[in-house]
Amino acid sequence: MSRPVLVTTEFRGVFFGYADDTTGDNVTLVNARNCIYWPATNGGFAGLASEGPAKGARIGAKVDKIDLRKVTSVTEVTSAAVKAWEAANVYRG
């Protein structure tokens, strides 16, 4: 069963989505979004997992599926953070 996770990569990518298998260096996410920027008030990437994107965060559009390579961490996402990720507006510059 897919669970909500925040994934970081060696290339400094930060992604939210739903994963079945998070073992190994590669992770596939569905209904995924990336975090382009987060403000200091987010408290780092762990804050993105515990609280979701704060005001001022820049969140990319949702994609159906993404395969991430060279994964450095997988963090469980709280239900409150899931709601914030799902509600975040798409940053368009």
What is the predicted function of each stretch?
Residues 1-93:
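Conserved RNA-binding domains used in RNP assembly and mRNA/RNA metabolism
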